[in-house]
Amino acid sequence: MQFSKMHGLGNDFMVIDGVTQNVYLTEEVIRKLADRHRGVGFDQLLLVEPPYDPELDFHYRIFNADGSEVAQCGNGARCFARFVTLKGLTNKQDIHVSTAKGKMVLTLKDEEKVRVNMGEPIWEPAQVPFTANKFEKNYILRTDLQTVLCGVVSMGNPHCVLQVEDINLTPVNELGPLLENHERFPERANIGFMQVVNRNHIKLRVFERGAGETQACGSGACGAVAVGIMQGVLDNNVQVDLSGGSLQIEWEGVGHPLYMTGDATHIYDGFIKL
């Protein structure tokens, strides 16, 4: 099976063309491939499939390193767009794809940048999914470590966002799994720790569902900015600094799609026998 290794700000992916080759993956196979010592190693595996809808270009599937399938990965979406172009699967500048939970438009800006229409943030608790009687800008969550105030949103996957004073002093790897697996998130959640620098600039660490803390999380950056705008602490165009690099997030507010712009880097091509 042929594959490519790619990354978006250090969030690394194994990308597989399921259009021109037959691909059958089980959770066990994905976990073996994800092993950084005995396999290829990655945060997520991205699978390019033919479109289910003739008006679209591709279907986009994402698997975490633990083998679980998820509906969204923002950094992966940028790499997906770069991959299908590099492999000659399309020559379009605007690439229309479906995911498990909706549709996306991926736009190639230049040889480095890709702009992704992430769709509208979803706030209704039942659709996140999150257990709450109604939407609120802030929710209180209690854990064994501490009680936190957070915003909750779906960008095609569930995000819980906490505002912190200093991301370097925040116990991300202790608090992250407690919130990821909190009983009010029936499908678990990605946990964002957001430090507001000013109204157009934040620093962010993300503890990803099924992957732990990664160098960058595109949908996490989108979720954090959406929550910050909804809570009134951010403006509509925000630079998000993650340990792997920076993303630019734009959102005009409720009723509008959210846009993410950032790099997508090809590392190498490979072949592995399953």
Curated annotation (Swiss-Prot):
A Pfam family per the record: DAP_epimerase
Catalytic residue positions: 73 (proton donor), 217 (proton acceptor)
Binding annotation for substrate: 11, 44, 64, 74-75, 157, 190, 208-209, 218-219
Source organism of this protein record: Actinobacillus pleuropneumoniae serotype 3 (strain JL03)
HAMAP family: DAP_epimerase
Localisation: Cytoplasm
UniProt keyword terms in alphabetical order: Amino-acid biosynthesis, Cytoplasm, Isomerase, Lysine biosynthesis
Annotated S-S bridges: none
GO CC, alphabetical: cytosol
Predominant subcellular localization, coarse grouping: cytoplasm
Protein name: Diaminopimelate epimerase
EC id: 5.1.1.7
Residue numbers marked as site, Important for dimerization: 268
Signal peptide feature range: none
Pathway: Amino-acid biosynthesis; L-lysine biosynthesis via DAP pathway; DL-2,6-diaminopimelate from LL-2,6-diaminopimelate: step 1/1
Catalytic function, reaction form: (2S,6S)-2,6-diaminopimelate = meso-2,6-diaminopimelate
Protein function: Catalyzes the stereoinversion of LL-2,6-diaminopimelate (L,L-DAP) to meso-diaminopimelate (meso-DAP), a precursor of L-lysine and an essential component of the bacterial peptidoglycan.
GO molecular function: diaminopimelate epimerase activity
Keyword Zinc-finger set for record: no
Subunit structure: Homodimer.
GO biological processes: lysine biosynthetic process via diaminopimelate
